[in-house]
Amino acid sequence: IWSESISTTATQLYAMEGKEVRFGEASSALWSALTTQVNNGSVNMMHDSSAPLTGLIALANMLINAIWGGIGCGLQQFIIYLFLAVFIAGLMIGRTPELFGRKIEAGEIKLLAVVILIQPITILTLTAVTLYFPALTGNSNPQYHAVSQVLYEYVSAFANNGSGFEGLADNTIWWNLSTSLALVLGRFPTLIIP
């Protein structure tokens, strides 16, 4: 909310482009933060028009994907964090880590490491491939913000959110297939592996 209320323009006016004027920039930024925490994908502002810090918060919310106890697919991430926290706490107190009467040992932690590494590998690989071939991107902004737009698209697909920075021509075969791959890798390995 703070980042939306300060102006970075020469006119010292609020940047209201892309925001819901009925609610103002503070409520729009709050909704942006909440909608990316609970994986519902609804918007009342264009996230691409938000201030840089507001966009970063939305991106971080989807990367964590376990705020508010992990609603939706975030519940899977929440359970992974729970297993990891129990394992680390068990190591710190010198006991064999247990959760619900079941021991958590090296085998389970190796599987958790695989699940945790799927997120950055999937998102960064798809982002790199998309940016390497500019014809695939369909980006309206060829500058540094293009990286944010592509990264946000894949993070949103992986986190099962559905929002986007929307500077992309993303109704193409490449975007449909690559975001579908990110969506599948965001949902099913966390159900199957642990």
Language-model features, listed with the residues they occupy:
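P-loop potassium selectivity filter motif centered on the GYG triad
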Residues: 5-73, 137-186
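Membrane-helix cytosolic exit motif
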Residues: 130-133, 190-194
